[in-house]
Amino acid sequence: MVLDVTWAVRWLTLCAQAMAENRVWLIELDRAIGDSDHGENMDRGFQAVLEKLAEARPETPGAALKLTAMTLMSKVGGAAGPLYGTAFLRASTALGDAAEIDPGRLADALVAARDGIVARGKAESGDKTMVDAWTPAAEAAQAAAADGAGTVLGVLVAAAEAAEAGAVATEPLVARKGRASYLGERSAGHRDPGAASSALILRAAVGAAA
């Protein structure tokens, strides 16, 4: 499987589908510990990404991700827009103008995305945020890429599975960052919506490569 601009556009298309299909679920997660708008914001943001991709027709994966970053920053409200915008922007920079992505560069892009989220949101693992999905995903991607037999699909699968496990693992945590932190102990018992949407995004990347 070659990860090129066709894959990138397919990934972002599947992201939009995932956000539309899981819109109500994300709203419900956010209603429990946030302000109820995460599902609506993510759905709206990725629909806008599809419109921009159709207009611009980017020629490289990096260009597609940069366009995504700019669109999410302008269209997604709350903290998610700047955080996801920074993640996609950092990933696009890591990819550069490469026409195709190898396992090592893919892992670098996922690490860069995680680092961007950490830098922007000032959150750490265990704070009950999307970092709890992205950090295990980035680490799993690095490990998969370091394997001599590692493939791009293997890197994506490892990242998605780690993100999904990380999102589930936010449920018992007490939030230390974001709006959920205002609830204190009452934030425990609920999955973080940002971690949940992060897992959807990384699972969509697998679907685009399958």
PLM regions and their residue ranges:
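N-terminal loops that bind phosphate or other acidic moieties
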Residues: 1-210
